[in-house]
Structures are given as structure tokens and as C-alpha cells.
Design a protein with these regions (language model features):
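Active-site neighborhood of HAD-like aspartate-dependent phosphohydrolases
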Residues: 2-60
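Substrate-recognition element of Asp-dependent hydrolases with the DxDx(T/V) motif
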Residues: 38, 123-127, 132-162, 175-177
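A metal-dependent, Asp-based hydrolase signature
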Residues: 64-141
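Conserved Lys-Pro-Asp/Glu-containing loop-to-beta segment of HAD-superfamily phosphomonoesterases
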Residues: 184-214
């Protein structure tokens, strides 16, 4: 087992009142490998235009915007795909249609995982980021209010949170993507949290593996903890994730939550 904390900027605040968690890749591994569904599908759409571009170049472009928009609602990545198609002279397609097809393909990858959790063949621990469930409980017991915000559709987040066993741990609520909203849901959650809870930004700590929540938290003056879990092995650091999180402005990088005491000590909780 590998565990190390990389502190880029020491926390110097008076203590945390609220914690925001991302879901996929931060708490849940149900959707592990979603990029392996989205990126090839998006590349397939662009290649079908017959522009005779280099396939590696297309893959590089798609990977860049998929990574950059990780953490926002899925529809934003689909909007970026539509823009890439239109730039090449292709027809505009409702990004919602791209999203439907992506989710259909993703479901074939993750259906057995959800079924396994539903019928008890798999334990929630099998598909939770190491130590994450216990860590949330410890924060709650320390009097820190916990919120969950995800770019995944809200109905799916709530259901998958119940499968992992964390649905009832978020006294600040579970917030996911809604079809009617095209604003960044995580930005709204963070700003509402600061306003409604009357927080100084330094009283907010965010845990996430996406560019968006880390960048938003850092810009607003909260403390951003990048969770660079190697989702395939469940242990150690994913260097690509780490690089993305560092670029977003992470104050600290952890591989998972297994060593709760070490994380609490590093955060002065």
C-alpha cells in the first residue's frame, strides 16, 4: 500500500466549517474508465467527417478538452464535441444527443458493477475510493458540514451514492447535473455554500479529482485537496491526474483517504 501527502501550500486558516466532495473518482469508482468510453466515441464522431486529419491529432484535441472540462456537467464535454465538429464543417447536432449515446455506451461498461452492488456480489468497499467513506464520517463527527457536487446527472449520483453507502452522509446535500441548467453546477454549489453558510473562503475545503472543482476552490480562496487516485489499482498516484490537479491550483495532493489521521493532521483538523 502506498500513501503519501504532497503539500504544495500549507493550510493557514482558522479551521474548516464545510467540506465539498466530488463523487466520481473521488469517492466512487463505479464509473472508473469513463474516459475510455468518451474519448474514443468523440474521436469516432470527428473521424466520420472524413477530413483526413491525423488520428493522433484528433485524439490529442479530444483528450485535452475532456480533461479540461472534467468536473463540469457531462453536457459541457458534449458541447465541446459539437463545436469541434462544426469547426470542421460538420452539421450542428444537439449536444444532448451526443450525451445520450455516450451514456448508453458507458452503461454497458458499468452495468455489471451496479448490479453487483445491488445484489450483494460486490461490497461497497470494492467500488469506493480507499478510505473515503470513513473519512467523510470523521469530518461529520468533527462538526464539518459535508456537501457532494458532481457533473454526473443528479438522479444517477444519488442512486450510486446509495450503492456506495454515502447517500446519507452529506448533510449539505447531494448536487448533480440538471438538464435545464447550463451553468457550472459546482460553481453554484460553492458560491451558495459560502453565502448561505456565511463562510470565509478559508473555512472551505474541497476534495476532488477534477480540474473544475479544484480551480474554482483555489480561485475563491478555499483550500483545494486534489485526490489523484490511480483508479485502476486503487492505490498510489495517477501522475496524469496529479499534473492536471497541480495545474488547476491544488494546495495538497493525496492518493486516497486510507490514512485518515495523516490527512487530518495535514489539514489541522
Amino acid at each position: 500500500m502506498s500513501f503519501s501527502i504532497e503539500t504544495i501550500k500549507e493550510y493557514g486558516g482558522r479551521g474548516f466549517k464545510c467540506a465539498l466532495f466530488d463523487f466520481d473518482g473521488t469517492i466512487s469508482l463505479i464509473r472508473e474508465g469513463w474516459q475510455k468510453v468518451m474519448i474514443p466515441y468523440f474521436c469516432e464522431v470527428i473521424e466520420a467527417l472524413g477530413t483526413n486529419e491525423n488520428k493522433d491529432g484528433i485524439c490529442e484535441e479530444v483528450t485535452e478538452f475532456v480533461d479540461r472540462l472534467t468536473g463540469k456537467q457531462t453536457i459541457f464535454q458534449c458541447i465541446a464535441l459539437d463545436e469541434a465538429v462544426v469547426r470542421r464543417g460538420g452539421e450542428h447536432v444537439d449536444p444532448g444527443e451526443y450525451k445520450k449515446e455516450y451514456l448508453r455506451r458507458l452503461e454497458t461498461r458499468i452495468a455489471d458493477r451496479k448490479k453487483g452492488l445491488e445484489i450483494g456480489c460486490l461490497s461497497p468497499d470494492d467500488l469506493a475510493v480507499r478510505g473515503s467513506v470513513e473519512f467523510i464520517k470523521v469530518l461529520r463527527n468533527a462538526g464539518i458540514r459535508c456537501f457532494l457536487a458532481s457533473g454526473t446527472d443528479e438522479e444517477d449520483v444519488i442512486y450510486e451514492a446509495s450503492l456506495i453507502g454515502v447517500k446519507n452522509l452529506f448533510d449539505g446535500g447531494i448536487h448533480g447535473a440538471k438538464d435545464a441548467l447550463l451553468d457550472c453546477s459546482k460553481e453554484a454549489v460553492i458560491k451558495n455554500m459560502i453565502e448561505e453558510q456565511k463562510l470565509d473562503p478559508e473555512e472551505l475545503v474541497t476534495f476532488g479529482d477534477g480540474f473544475v472543482e479544484i480551480e474554482l476552490t483555489a480561485k475563491l480562496g478555499g483550500y483545494a485537496v486534489g485526490v489523484a487516485t490511480n483508479e485502476k489499482t486503487g492505490d498510489g498516484i495517477d501522475e496524469k491526474k496529479r499534473a492536471r490537479l497541480m495545474l488547476a491550483g491544488a494546495d495538497m495532493i493525496i492518493p486516497h483517504f486510507e490514512d485518515t489521521e495523516a490527512i487530518l493532521k495535514a489539514l489541522h483538523i
